[in-house]
Amino acid sequence: IKVNLWPRLNPVPTVSFATRYLHASAGVMVTASHNPSKYNGYKVYGADGCQITTEAAAAVLAEIEKLDIFADVKKMDFDEAVKEGKIEYISDDVLTAFIEKVKSQSVLFGEEVNKNVSIVYSPLNGTGYIPVTRTLEEMGYTNITIVEEQRLPDGNFPTCPYPNPEIKEAMALGMDYAKRNNADLLLATDPDCDRVGIAVKDKNGDYQLLTGNQTGMLLFDYICSQRTKHNRMPADPVMAVSYTHLTLPTNSR
């Protein structure tokens, strides 16, 4: 089996993207996501870059259970596999392509960003630092302060035992940074960088952590207003909302 391997830690979204970009049959991410350090997990993506369905996961598990993990699993030396081309390191060009795709989703439509926006960002000792800061900076946001204690990857999560950015406890250090820097916005991503926590300053100067529903509606309102402003709104638009990951895919026209 030919394997394309990231040479360093990378977020879940880049694995999903690379699966399609490199025309792979599947993608795999070993991660505990936003859970405490004692846990670990295994995320699998199909050739379309989407997480496999429950049915597909059951089929994979059924095949695994047929095997003796010692006698039936084929193994070879890692360096030999690299030498033979069975393992190939993914180049930085793929990360660049991912970031370009993210930037292409912008609805600024040529408007200049507000470079004065002050942002505090924390990757919560996970994988988000390079792709998130690079994307923000390439979009024009340069006033970014990093939560230094949480900048580098550390699977023990020493400053944040439960690194879920949707809970206040995980955002505590970032909140302190935001207050000290009088930031407009606090962003934090969970360790595998597929979940974001957002806190904004209210009229009293206090920082309020947004729920996922609030963030979703704010984004929806912004997208609609920008498309309307620039005459990019399609005729008879429809918004469909998916309430679980097992329901109908969300589409708009």
Residue ranges and their predicted role:
Residues 1-39, 142-197:
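N-terminal small/polar loop signature for handling phosphorylated ligands or for N-terminal nucleophile
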Residues 5-12, 208-213, 240-242:
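Active-site nucleophile and cofactor-binding loops and adjacent substrate-binding regions
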Residues 39-45, 194-212:
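Short Gly/Thr/Asp-enriched flexible loops that form oxyanion-binding sites at enzyme active sites
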Residues 40-172, 178:
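Gly/Ser/Thr-enriched, mixed-charge loops and adjacent short helices
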Residues 53, 206-224:
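Gly/Ser/Thr-rich active-site loops/lids in small-molecule metabolic enzymes
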Residues 228:
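Conserved phosphate-handling catalytic cores of large alpha/beta enzymes
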Residues 244-250:
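Conserved small/polar residues in nucleotide/adenosyl-binding loops
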